[in-house]
Amino acid sequence: VTGVTESVGDSRDDLMAVAQDPTGALFASGHAGPGSPFSEPMGLIRSDDAGRAWSEISLGGEADFHSLAADGTAIAGWATTGALLWSEDEGDSWLPGPVTTAYSVALFMEQLWLAIPDVGLATWNRDANAIEPVGEEGVLLATADDGSAMWRVGPDGSVHRTLNGREWRQAGSVGAAEAIAASRNSAFIVTATGVQRLQVGG
């Protein structure tokens, strides 16, 4: 992908994770930059104007989320304090999940999906508060902006998409990936050399 980048808003905070829910609200976390009004670490912050202005929601000075997911009903995040956290009130309060380490989290088909070291891809059975491996590998996860698909990047850089959580279609390979964002038919993946776009039909 080629083009020109441009700053949004005046913030110089170091955002480590960003998620968007179906209403367009952005949720983020990371480290406070110079002149920032936020705590360090930032906890969960929110923007309702596409990232121009942000407000603190919770966990300021406590949590540094490195992966976040939001679907309009729940927010899930993995924090570097070693906590998987779950909220059903837009981040005002949190419940702990069953793992202490996760590469990435995603919300898809009303389920929390996790990419976990030494486990691979798994879902969270909330009733039993336990993870259930699904037999696939993954280090990065992303749900399409309209919730219609989920993408995963494997440890070998292979990229797959699912529309139902069971059947996966390979879209390509990118090598070592650092971040991913997706729509139903496209994934944008950040690597050490730039941003790559993969597309798949259907």
Model-derived segments and spans:
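Extracellular glycan-interacting surfaces
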Residues: 1-202
